[in-house]
C-alpha cells in the first residue's frame, strides 16, 4: 500500500493560545491568569535576577484576594522544600512580600500581616505533620524496595528542605525566637523526625 502524508485540518489542529484568535481571551484580572503569571515568574526566579523578578512577581496582583495568596504561599513553600539550596532566596521573597501592602489589606491597619499569617500557618502545618506517616503514605502502594527507598528519600528531602526554609525565615525576621524555641525541642526529641 502507498502511504500518503496526513492531511492538515486547519479547523481542528492545535494552535498556541497566543495565536488562536477564535478562542476567547481570559480576563487579565482573573484569579487563574494572575496565578499563572505569578508561577511563571516564580519558576524563572534566581539569585541573579531576584530584584527585577521579585518586583514583577509582586506586580502581578497576587495580593488581590486570599485564594490567590494561599495558592502562591503553598507554591513558595513547596519550591523551598524541593530546592533547599534556594531557601534563602525564597525567604527573601517572603520578606519582600510581607513588607508590601496587599490589595486585600487595603482597610487593615497593619499591612503585610495577612501574608505573614498565612505563611506561618502553612509552615506550622508542614512542621507538625508526622514524617514517618508521610513516608508510610508515600510507600504504601509501592512493591519495589528500590522505589520505596526513593520515595522515602523524597519525603526526607522535603522535610530537610522545610527545616532549612524555617531557618531562613528566622534569619529574615519572619519567624520569632519564640517559634524557634518551640521547634527546637520537638526536633531534638525526635518526635517529628524520621
Predicted regions and their residues:
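Alpha-helical interaction scaffolds
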Residues: 1-194
Amino acid at each position: 500500500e502507498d502511504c500518503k502524508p496526513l492531511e492538515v485540518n486547519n479547523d481542528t489542529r492545535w494552535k498556541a493560545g497566543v495565536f488562536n484568535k477564535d478562542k476567547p481571551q481570559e480576563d487579565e484580572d482573573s484569579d487563574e491568569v494572575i496565578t499563572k503569571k505569578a508561577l511563571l515568574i516564580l519558576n524563572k526566579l534566581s539569585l541573579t535576577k531576584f530584584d527585577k523578578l521579585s518586583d514583577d512577581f509582586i506586580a502581578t496582583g497576587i495580593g488581590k484576594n486570599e485564594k490567590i495568596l494561599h495558592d502562591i504561599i503553598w507554591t513558595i513553600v513547596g519550591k523551598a522544600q524541593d530546592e533547599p539550596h534556594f531557601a534563602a532566596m525564597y525567604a527573601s521573597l517572603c520578606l519582600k512580600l510581607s513588607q508590601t501592602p496587599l490589595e486585600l489589606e487595603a482597610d487593615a491597619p497593619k499591612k503585610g500581616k495577612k501574608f505573614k499569617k498565612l505563611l506561618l500557618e502553612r509552615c506550622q502545618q508542614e512542621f507538625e505533620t508526622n514524617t514517618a506517616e508521610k513516608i508510610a503514605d508515600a510507600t504504601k502502594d509501592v512493591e519495589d524496595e528500590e522505589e520505596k527507598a526513593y520515595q522515602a528519600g523524597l519525603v526526607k528531602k522535603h522535610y530537610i528542605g522545610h527545616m532549612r526554609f524555617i531557618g531562613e525565615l528566622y534569619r529574615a525576621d519572619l519567624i520569632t525566637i519564640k517559634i524557634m524555641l518551640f521547634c527546637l525541642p520537638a526536633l531534638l526529641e525526635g518526635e517529628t523526625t524520621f
